[in-house]
Every structure is written in C-alpha cells, then in structure tokens.
Amino acid sequence: LKRTTQLITGALLMFGAALMQAQPAHATVVKNSFLKTQRTIRTYNINKHAKLTLPKGTVVQVAGTKHLHGNKYVDVYVDRLSYNIRKPLLSVKKPTIYSHWIRAKGDNFKQIHKPSYLSYYAAQSDGKQSHGKIRTETGNLWKGTRLPVDYATSVAARLRVTTNGYLEYDASSPFVFKISPKPTTSLKVAKASQPMASGKTILTFKSRLKQLPFTKKSKGHYQLTITNAEAGTITVVPNTSKVQKILTNWIFKVGKQSWYENNSVTTFK
C-alpha cells in the first residue's frame, strides 16, 4: 500500500509539473495586470490615430483583454506611461488612453508583479464598481486635502509615478484631462521600497526635483517618501441639496506636505 501511495503521489507531482509547463505564460493576465515588454513594440493607439513605441523593458498596465482565433490580446494604458511614450497622443484630435490590441505572447511580454514604486496606491483596484461607486485609482496625487467642487475648471499641483517608473510633477495641471499633459519636470526612479506595515513608499533617485521635499542621503542619492496618512475627505458636487456626485479623497504625506488622491466617485441620477 505504501509503495502504491508513493507511485500515485509521484504521478500526481509529474502531472502537476506538466500542467504548469503547459499553462501559457499569459493565462493569468487580466485587466490591471502588469507586464514588461521583451522587445521594442511598435503599435498605435486604439483607433490608430497615433503611432506609439514601447521600448524593450517598458512596464505597462493592462487595460483589457480579448481572445481572437485562440490567441490572447491585450491593450495597455498608454496615458499612464512616461511623457516620451505618450507624447504622440497629445497631438491627435481624438486621443484615446489605450493602445491598439497586442498579442500577449512570450516574445512580446513577461508578466510581473506590481512594481514597488507604485505601492503607494491601489493600482489594481482601478475601475472596480460596487453599489454605484467606481474606484478611480490612477496614482495622481494633488497638493492639498480635498478635491475642489469646481474641479472641472480648476488646476493644481499634481504628481504621479508612471507605470514605467518616472516621477512626474506638474505645477499647474487641470483636474480633468484625457491625456496627461507634458509635466513641468520628471525624474527616473532608481529604486523603491515599502517597509512592512509602515504605510510608506520610499522612492530613491540619483538627483532631485526642487519642487518636491526630497531628502539627500549622500551624493547622487536622494529620497522622496510618500506616506499613507490613513485619513480621507469627501467632495460633494454640487454642494447644495441636489447632490450629483460624491467623490472621496485619500490623503498622503509627501515629506511633510499633504497631498491626496481622488480614489472613488459615486454618481446619482
């Protein structure tokens, strides 16, 4: 009996290993998954109005998936990439934030975990809906503690870390935009960490931006810390008895400064 059990166990292990090997690398790719390009990919935006180039090694976030003739395809959020990649979208009349469909095969992409430099926000919850509330987790942080009621016509300082690891700062960004405008300045993240249970995302750079509260650690070694303040505010639009929207704002500390992310919206008919 013992020998039989060993044979069965061995067979199951071999079957499991074979099954894992047979499982396509793209099988677990879903909306909001992260991928890294394995070669330079030349494509378009979804309506083919702009040519786009995704250099080899670019981290992208999946906007959607589809199957065609037994193959899996993805489109990615181009607007969440650095300015040098999304720039062509800013010159077309009807820009879209998504790429054209790209085959999700190993020659094109490798699936990766969420990058540590994006740890400050819930990137993989973006777009989820529950009881009329839509999550808006895009990583855009605005200076202050609350989205203004007239946000549709207002501007403010904004920062974010792009999917491919660039810190972007815009001194006067509109709250409403289709494609993120050219930033005032930007910087490549050299390294990132998130000490366990600290609520902090520590970004390390080789230089610094004068507009933000960097800490100099040594020559060519600067840090910017984004801390979850575990507090929030709400914005009611309009702020009268006939409410149309309620937006929630989650507060962060960048250094000692207060910034916030608008992380959900509930719309009333």
Q: What are the residue ranges of the model-derived segments?
A:
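Beta-loop motif signature
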Residues: 26-269
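Sec-dependent N-terminal signal peptides of Gram-positive bacterial secreted proteins and lipoproteins
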Residues: 1-27
